[in-house]
């Protein structure tokens, strides 16, 4: 894909430390408002580029999942600005092609599944983001547009968390089939207190009565000991990577948590050999 898009190579092109352009969502909102169908040739080039990048997103490079997903929403009303955002994603992936998800038995609690959920609220349809980690690496990641709009950030966060709980329930079933049962509820990190409170309380409030009953599945999964919500700061919620365009600092911090790069694994193995640290 890089050779086809850049036949002269990428050595003289800009280097990017993050895949998402700072104005990505602004460009998307402008394109959505205009909603002008592109020329057929440009539309084909755009879909080819964004569709090609999408192949590596969920399974190999979830760090680019949100940026690519945002570009993919504009298939029918793509613009030159969004094409430039897609080119940036491709350049970022090409410059960091040595990165990937690393699973290691030396990761802390390697046999325990953990998760994180987040949402980016919009007036129209918000973005649900989250992931499941096992053995240090992200085994499953999502960044998807919600089925319907939500009138509040709390509602969008609840919908996102409940959707990820379905994925957690499926993953726990697969792990049990693979002889790796989860003896305790899977911890899911959330950074919204409304989600945390809803998961622990069956009562409803007037501000949340507009949500469908299915949006409260996190509460049902909590009371059946499938998940356990944990309230964390936004700066500690690695699912933020799947819902927002982050600056370099927080992006690199969350990328290490999501990908578990090989240098982290080597450091742990060296510590084990030296008797400094032992896996749990």
Give the positions of each predicted feature:
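Long, low-complexity, charge-biased intrinsically disordered regions
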Residues: 1-280
């Amino acid at each position: 894909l890089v050779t086809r898009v850049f036949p002269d190579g990428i050595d003289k092109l800009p280097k990017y430390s993050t895949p998402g352009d700072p104005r990505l969502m602004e460009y998307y909102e402008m394109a959505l408002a205009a909603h002008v169908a592109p020329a057929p040739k440009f539309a084909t080039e755009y879909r080819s580029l964004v569709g090609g990048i999408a192949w590596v997103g969920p399974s190999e490079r979830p760090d680019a999942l949100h940026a690519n997903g945002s570009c993919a929403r504009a298939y029918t009303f793509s613009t030159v600005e969004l094409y430039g955002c897609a080119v940036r994603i491709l350049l970022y992936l090409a410059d960091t092609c040595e990165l990937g998800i690393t699973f290691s038995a030396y990761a802390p609690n390697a046999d325990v599944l953990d998760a994180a959920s987040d949402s980016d609220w919009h007036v129209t349809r918000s973005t649900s983001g989250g992931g499941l980690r096992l053995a240090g690496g992200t085994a499953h990641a999502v960044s998807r547009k919600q089925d319907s709009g939500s009138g509040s950030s709390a509602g969008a966060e609840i919908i996102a968390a409940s959707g990820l709980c379905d994925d957690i329930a499926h993953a726990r079933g697969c792990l049990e089939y693979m002889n790796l049962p989860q003896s305790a509820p899977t911890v899911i990190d959330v950074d919204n207190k409304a989600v945390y409170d809803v998961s622990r309380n069956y009562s409803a409030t007037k501000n949340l009565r507009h949500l469908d009953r299915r949006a409260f599945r996190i509460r049902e999964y909590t009371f059946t000991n499938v998940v356990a919500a944990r309230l964390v700061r936004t700066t500690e919620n690695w699912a933020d990577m799947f819902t927002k365009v982050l600056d370099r600092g927080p992006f690199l911090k969350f990328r290490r948590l999501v990908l578990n790069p090989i240098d982290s694994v080597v450091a742990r193995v060296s510590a084990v050999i030296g008797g400094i640290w032992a896996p749990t």
